[in-house]
């Protein structure tokens, strides 16, 4: 049930009847304050200006045509021409009933699309670090939301699995007689990488061998391909452990590494030349883009093939976008890549559009994000100033949550405590990130994220258990409760019901904008409204069974909404804390 969409259409029709153009925007929004109703239509200002009349005068005319019978109990004009809409308690009650009767809580299924989501993208032969956290969990929240809404989602884990480093690694493994790379731990491999790089920089004979190995690998030599596959296997096996710990939905089947696009690159360069988009410049192949200027104000040159014949990330990204449209049949492509890559992506996509590889009707969206910072406001590092490994961060989260949970539950069995600590610890790390607007940097703070107050995972998980505790005490007959009507008489009942029915609107925003913090804010607000409702509207000691059952149903929908909302974020709920 999308009340905002329903009201928008009703107000738009009334505006047209009052003389507004057919493309008018009613600008129906959820009201910020309770005294302004549940929704506000703010579109009169812009339209009245076009019509040469006062906004309030237009609002009055719109009201004469606005039929919200059975939806709103009151509609009033406020200020210079805002229309405040107060939802009818009977309308709220009816739709709470419908939401409870639906597995999807009344959420409609939009027109199905094929959506490719590019996220996580770690590098082969390196362990995942905290820099991979945001892309991995924000992208996964988007995937979960889009899948819940009914879209066909293709996860694309664009791992860095190609390049000169593989010549180095294979040469060094061979030198160390470590051909059986499949038995190595990734931690070993990182050490190997450092040693290989040192030798590459200091030993010209070794560097030459490494360069030869790259050529052999790229030409398809089976021995070198097999060594390369082993390196990829070790890395992705290790990464899968991290994905599972993080409760993200990525699997090995979702890996679409850079190597996938290699066979396409010569053809793309040739095609761009044939179309007159790419030219030779100082031995390299370059596309000049009018949309991007260099310091001299001239069109910027984007290199797609180096003088030595090598390709660049831009070339791969052009091939990647083409593949996602032509082979995966994407209707929409979302890239969860940090903000530093924005210009690079815009340049690649400008070439993609000019070449006609992806039509304008298929959006390519960079859902960029800021950095994770330490308390000092600088990029998050270890005490020694090194990069924080993601596995180490999750270990610390688990340890801190274990202490927190044990303190509150000294008698809890060890296995139960471990499971709870895992849900709380991992949930805290994820929620702390997801609850921030992804476009901004944020401060990573253990104390804040593990607090039981404020917009945190422990608070949300506790809020859920609090609702469940009502049902444990109530000794409910499920059939009787299902048949009982919902009756809304108190203001707090109405406020809670209205917010519950805004779940679909929230999902729609997250799906459109890729902003999971909007879901976090909604769930936090919902938990707060339930708390006020619980305090002022007795449930178990209600004046009669009819009111008791009705309030139990509001509590039931609250629990279901909190659980489903947290699930779209990849946050586990718990039965008790």
Curated annotation (Swiss-Prot):
Keywords: Aminoacyl-tRNA synthetase, ATP-binding, Cytoplasm, Ligase, Nucleotide-binding, Protein biosynthesis. It catalyses: tRNA(Arg) + L-arginine + ATP = L-arginyl-tRNA(Arg) + AMP + diphosphate. GO terms for biological process: arginyl-tRNA aminoacylation. One of its GO terms (molecular function) is ATP binding. InterPro entries: aa-tRNA-synth_I_CS (IPR001412), Arg-tRNA-ligase (IPR001278), Arg-tRNA-synth_N (IPR005148), Arg-tRNA-synth_N_sf (IPR036695), ArgRS_core (IPR035684), DALR_anticod-bd (IPR008909), Rossmann-like_a/b/a_fold (IPR014729), tRNAsynth_Ia_anticodon-bd (IPR009080). The keyword Transferase does not apply. A motif ('HIGH' region) lies at residues 122-132. SUPFAM superfamilies: Anticodon-binding domain of a subclass of class I aminoacyl-tRNA synthetases, Arginyl-tRNA synthetase (ArgRS), N-terminal 'additional' domain, Nucleotidylyl transferase. GO terms for cellular component: cytoplasm. Its EC number is 6.1.1.19. It comes from the Bacteria. Belongs to the class-I aminoacyl-tRNA synthetase family. Monomer. This is Arginine--tRNA ligase. It comes from Escherichia coli (strain 55989 / EAEC). The lineage of its organism: Bacteria, Pseudomonadati, Pseudomonadota, Gammaproteobacteria, Enterobacterales.
